Amino acid sequence: VLSPADKSNVKAAWGKVGGHAGDYGAEALERMFLSFPTTKTYFPHFDLSHGSAQVKGHGKKVADALTVAVAHVDDMPNALSALSDLHAHKLRVDPVNFKLLSHCLLVTLAAHLPADFTPAVHASLDKFLASVSTVLTSKYR
């Protein structure tokens, strides 16, 4: 459960991401594909090369979903319901992949926002991404 301090940290950190959200989302995906090659199996139709339009497009989708989650941090299950349905019933993404992408997002944010990525902010973002992952996998049952 996210504390009020966690919510404040997440909103502040995501606010600093600003217009770079799509780029950071794409970078996190690239990190995931390089670090965890098995994740590529969910994207057989994508050009997974560095800077590809498809990876950039999906990175923007990831970032947009996180922006929605930040804006609706107190009601993520409703805000992300359609996305949860998509990943559970149509895409059938193995839930472990959300943890892998979350890790890559944390690394990307730490690399781009080093002065803002304090231990407290890191912990809050980690809890937030775990909450998003839980919501996205909630309909697998």
Swiss-Prot record:
Residues the entry annotates as binding O2: 58
Residue(s) carrying Phosphothreonine: 108, 134, 137
Domain Globin: 1-141
GO molecular function annotations of the record: haptoglobin binding; heme binding; iron ion binding; organic acid binding; oxygen binding; oxygen carrier activity; peroxidase activity
GO cellular component, one term: blood microparticle
Binding sites annotated in the UniProt record for heme b: 87
Domain of life from the UniProt record: Eukaryota
SUPFAM superfamilies attached to this UniProt entry: Globin-like (SSF46458)
Entry-linked PANTHER family: HEMOGLOBIN FAMILY MEMBER, HEMOGLOBIN SUBUNIT ALPHA
Quaternary structure, from the entry: Heterotetramer of two alpha chains and two beta chains.
Stated name of the protein: Hemoglobin subunit alpha
Species this protein is from: Leontocebus fuscicollis
